[in-house]
Design a protein with these regions (language model features):
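Mixed-charge, Lys/Arg-rich low-complexity intrinsically disordered regions
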Residues: 1-15
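Residues that act as N-cap/strand-start positions at coil-to-secondary-structure junctions
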Residues: 16-18, 32, 54
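A short, Trp-centered hydrophobic/proline-enriched beta-strand micro-motif
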Residues: 18-26
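Short coil-to-beta-strand transition motifs
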Residues: 25-32, 58-61
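Short beta-strand-centered aromatic/proline hotspots
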Residues: 31-40
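Basic/aromatic-rich interaction segments and small domains that mediate binding to polyanionic partners
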Residues: 39-57
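Structured surface patches comprising rigid loops and adjacent beta-strands/short helices at the edges
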Residues: 60-71
């Protein structure tokens, strides 16, 4: 994913604020996770998430993600 549109970024920020679930596709794998925070790592943005069943922390760099969908 090259960049998020303003609408997609607003949806992502809202999901983080509410602690909503996200469906993230990266390298052919689908992840359903709970959004926790948006972070900057140098010039790259990443999404800090947790797995809803195990509680394992997962980090996703936005520039490595194929698609992001907010589950309302």
């Amino acid at each position: 994913m090259a960049r998020l549109t303003p609408v997609e970024y607003d949806a992502l920020e809202g999901a983080v604020a509410r602690g909503s679930r996200l469906v993230i596709h990266r390298r052919g794998t689908e992840y359903v996770v709970v959004a926790k925070s948006l972070l900057l790592d140098g010039a790259r943005e990443r999404i800090a998430t947790v797995h809803p069943s195990t509680g394992d922390a997962l980090l996703f760099y936005i520039d490595e993600v194929d698609s992001i969908q907010v589950i309302e």
